[in-house]
C-alpha cells in the first residue's frame, strides 16, 4: 500500500511515489513529516535495485528523465505509437545522476517464437482473438489456438487481425530476433524486454 496507495485515483502523485521508492530501496530517509517516514525496506543489502520507469506516454518519459533513471517504452501496449516522441523527450530532458550519467533506454515488446513460422502463427491465434476483443473492452481468457482460429470472424475483423499479424514479432526464433534487433537499432535502444503469453506454456 505504501508503495502505490490509491494509484488510479491520484496519478499526479506518481512522481512522489517514485521518489519514495528510490529512498526506500537505497536506505535513505524520507522527510520527517512524510506519513511513511518511519517505514524502512528490509532486508537492506550491499547493492541497490535498479529502478526503471515502464511507460507508454510522454509523461512516464518525463518522470524517468527527471529522476535520472532508465526508461522503458511499453511497445507491446501501443504497438510503438508514441515511442519515438517519448524516447526523444526522455533523452533531451534527462538529468544525469551518479549511477546513470547518461540516458539508458529500453523497449518492452510482445513476441512469440516457435520452430516454424506456421507453428508460431498457429499459437498467435489465441492472442489475435484476445486482442481483438480487448480493444472493445472485453477481456476474454486466452483460448486454445485451435478454438480461437475457428471463431467466425467478420471480414473487418479478419482484416484487423491480418494488420496485427503484419506488425507482430511472431515466427521462428531467428526471424523474431532479427526483427527485435532491427527495432532496437532503429531507435537506439540499450536493452530489450520481451513479454509472451500463450494458451500452453509448453508450446
Task: Map each language-model feature to its residues.
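Hydrophobic faces of well-ordered beta-strands that scaffold small-molecule active sites
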Residues: 49-54, 69-74, 103-110, 190-194
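A conserved active-site cap/scaffold subdomain adjacent to cofactor or substrate pockets
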Residues: 57-81, 86-87, 100
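Acidic/polar active-site rim loop that often engages polyanionic ligands
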Residues: 1-6, 68
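Short beta->alpha connector loops
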Residues: 55-58, 175
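Glycine-rich, proline-tolerant flexible connector loops at the mouths of alpha/beta enzymes
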Residues: 75-77, 195-202
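Aromatic-rich, solvent-exposed beta-strand/loop patch
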Residues: 38-48
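Flexible loop/turn segments at secondary-structure boundaries
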Residues: 60-61, 80-81, 113-116, 200-202
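An alpha-helical appendage that flanks or caps ligand/catalytic pockets
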Residues: 5-40, 81-187
Amino acid at each position: 500500500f505504501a508503495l502505490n496507495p490509491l494509484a488510479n485515483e491520484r496519478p499526479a502523485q506518481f512522481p512522489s511515489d517514485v521518489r519514495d521508492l528510490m529512498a526506500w530501496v537505497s536506505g535513505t530517509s524520507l522527510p520527517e513529516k512524510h506519513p511513511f517516514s518511519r517505514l524502512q525496506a528490509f532486508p537492506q543489502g550491499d547493492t541497490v535495485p535498479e529502478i526503471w520507469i515502464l511507460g507508454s506516454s510522454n509523461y512516464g518519459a518525463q518522470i524517468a528523465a527527471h529522476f535520472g533513471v532508465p526508461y522503458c517504452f511499453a511497445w507491446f501496449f501501443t504497438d510503438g505509437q508514441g515511442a519515438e516522441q517519448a524516447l526523444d523527450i526522455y533523452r533531451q530532458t534527462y538529468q544525469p545522476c551518479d549511477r546513470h550519467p547518461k540516458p539508458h533506454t529500453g523497449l518492452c515488446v510482445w513476441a512469440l517464437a516457435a520452430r516454424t513460422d506456421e507453428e508460431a502463427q498457429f499459437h498467435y491465434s489465441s492472442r489475435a482473438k484476445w486482442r481483438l476483443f480487448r480493444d472493445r473492452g472485453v477481456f476474454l481468457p486466452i483460448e486454445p489456438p485451435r478454438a480461437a482460429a475457428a471463431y467466425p470472424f467478420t471480414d473487418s475483423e479478419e482484416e484487423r487481425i491480418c494488420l496485427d499479424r503484419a506488425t507482430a514479432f511472431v515466427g521462428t526464433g531467428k526471424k523474431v530476433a532479427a526483427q527485435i534487433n532491427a527495432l532496437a537499432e532503429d531507435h537506439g535502444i540499450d536493452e530489450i524486454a520481451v513479454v509472451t503469453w500463450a494458451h500452453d506454456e509448453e508450446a
